Amino acid sequence: MKVLLLTGLGALFFAYYWDDNFDPASLQGARVLLTGASAGVGEELAYHYARLGSHLVLTAHTEALLQKVVGNCRKLGAPKVFYIAADMASPEAPESVVQFALDKLGGLDYLVLNHIGGVPAGTRARTPQATRWLMQVNFLSYVQLTSRALPSLTDSKGSLVVVSSLLGRVPTSFSTPYSAAKFALDSFFGSLRRELDVQDVNVAITMCVLGLRDRASAAEAVRGVTRVKAAPGPKAALAVIRGGATRAAGVFYPWRFHLLCLLRRWLPRPRAWFIRQDLNVTAAAAA
């Protein structure tokens, strides 16, 4: 019975992803602020938006990497592309980034929140200061960016696209503070969606649940701890863009993560078993 149930759910998810009414032309001329744009999924998001003719403001921590991405976006046909280097660990950075984007683009149609800050898997934030840093980068900066951009998104009937993680839906071992920040994101934006709805504010919120990021820093952080393979950056980025453009409530990539999230509620014991299979417990505990 369980196998039949999972098979049926899988068929439904495939049908959904193949029929999402995505119109690439809807992104031509769209004004997009993208964070975490210098590498991995964020870099691929920038390239997809550039190909689709969006106007871009890109931000990340490292200016040299941003400059490379900006140059590539221009080659791919982005009509406008600007960048601002910013450290989201600084409480002042989010507001200055949004103001820069508003000044350059005259408003926003999409705010795509993708930046992350973490610690190596298997370690814990061993001090209150380290935990505060994690929460500032992975949660509070998202709140600040959203609060500052929301008036413009309200005017444009725009979209908030939040790139999160499976760790924000399903608790797992050896990622306590990072997972806490991701759960906070899910709760905050879920509540905000309800508030906007009851106030008849036409701003969509798309929560994107992705797997391991396809970038060197992510691979190094989980080396020896997890057996999970990174999701291909271009494919994950395209799933995020499709979800945002169609104003979907949620995106799961790979799609099986949706099943794992459902297992959390319906079948907690199998869910725990699946998670354990992906962990090298000995290596993580020794970290």
From Swiss-Prot:
Its EC number is 1.1.1.-. SUPFAM superfamilies: NAD(P)-binding Rossmann-fold domains. One of its GO terms (cellular component) is extracellular region. Its main location: secreted. Substrate binds at S165. Unidirectional NADP(+)-dependent cortisol dehydrogenase (in vitro). This is Hydroxysteroid 11-beta-dehydrogenase 1-like protein. It comes from Macaca fascicularis (Crab-eating macaque).
